[in-house]
A protein has these predicted regions:
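Residue(s) in the substrate-gating loop at a strand-loop-helix junction
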Residues: 7
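Hydrophobic structural elements of the Rossmann-like NAD(P)H-binding subdomain
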Residues: 3, 45-48, 58, 99, ...
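Catalytic Tyr-x(3-8)-Lys segment
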Residues: 64-83
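Active-site helix of classical SDR
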Residues: 23, 31
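Short, flexible catalytic-loop segment of classical short-chain dehydrogenase/reductase
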Residues: 11, 28, 45, 49-59
Length: 110
C-alpha cells in the first residue's frame, strides 16, 4: 500500500496558504491518478488529510491563535499524532480501499 500525507488545506484551501494548498491538492490528484494506474496490480493508494494535529509546530502558537483554530473544529480539540498513526495502520491493512482521501480533522472539513 502507498499512503500519501496531504492536508485538509488541500481539500478546503486557507487564507495565506495558496502555495501549500495547491501542493496538497496536487497530492490528492496524484493519489487518485496513481490509484487508478496501479489498482490492477493490487497496489492500493490512499491519502490522509490531517487537520490540526498537536505537534512541535502547533506548540509555538499563541493561545489566541489556538483558540481561533479550535473554534472552527466541531469536536473542539486538536488531533494527536497517535491518531494519525492509527489511521495509517488501518489504511495499510485494507485490501479493498484505494483512491480515497481520509480527513482526520475533528470535523473541520465537513
Amino acid at each position: 500500500a502507498i499512503i500519501n500525507m496531504s492536508s485538509v488545506v488541500g481539500l478546503m484551501g486557507n487564507i495565506g496558504q495558496a502555495n501549500y494548498a495547491a501542493s496538497k491538492a496536487g497530492l490528492i490528484g496524484f493519489t487518485k491518478s496513481v490509484a487508478r494506474e496501479v489498482a490492477n496490480r493490487n497496489i492500493r493508494v490512499n491519502a490522509i488529510a490531517p487537520g490540526m494535529i498537536e505537534s512541535d509546530m502547533t506548540a509555538v502558537l499563541s493561545d489566541k491563535v489556538k483558540d481561533a483554530m479550535l473554534a472552527q473544529i466541531p469536536m473542539k480539540e486538536f488531533g494527536q499524532a497517535e491518531q494519525v498513526a492509527d489511521l495509517t495502520v488501518f489504511l495499510a491493512g485494507q485490501d479493498y480501499l484505494t483512491g480515497q482521501v481520509v480527513a482526520i480533522d475533528g470535523g473541520l472539513s465537513m
